[in-house]
């Protein structure tokens, strides 16, 4: 327990800036039975978690501070005879995403495991020149007398799927303000919903 508590203190100090409220608790439950690994299997699992990359892989060359390619270990499950790790791979570059996917797969096989791909969606690559983005920005500025906030983000968005269906498809993603998205406290701002409606109808009139 002392070793675990010392390790917890080291981790809390290491992540004090990015995760200031990090809490690690170790409880001694007494004797009991649970799944455990022998020394060789334990070392193999440590190698798996250390050798397969995790986190930011590459930053964008076009936009300062934007992550371009990453992967994250989201779920790790230890069963009676198996260990399964689920990674989410994201990239705004299709070639980088495919390379990283292949790299993780090859490393998994090298370590004696197998892998499968699920929920694969194409990358939505950044365009320096976008006519629809410029049109939306101009319409927003004119309708609401303020500059449109145009941002890029490192996330999985359906536009990547749609853009891959037609060559040279120009896409943007926009919508009303949503607070606490993807949580039970999710809320939609009604006033921004009205602005979104006015914006999209104005742009559609220009495209008609």
Feature-to-residue mapping (PLM):
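Generic non-transmembrane alpha-helical segments
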Residues: 3-14, 103-111, 131, 135-143, ...
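His/Asp/Glu-rich mid-to-C-terminal helical/loop segments that flank catalytic regions of hydrolases
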Residues: 1, 40-50, 58, 98-101, ...
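Short, solvent-exposed polar/charged micro-motifs at secondary-structure junctions
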Residues: 33-39, 125-130, 158-163
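Short, low-complexity, polar/charged sequence segments that are solvent-exposed and flexible
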Residues: 6-10, 45-46, 92-95, 104-110, ...
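Zn-dependent metallopeptidase/amidohydrolase metal-coordination segment
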Residues: 68-70, 74-81, 88, 140-203
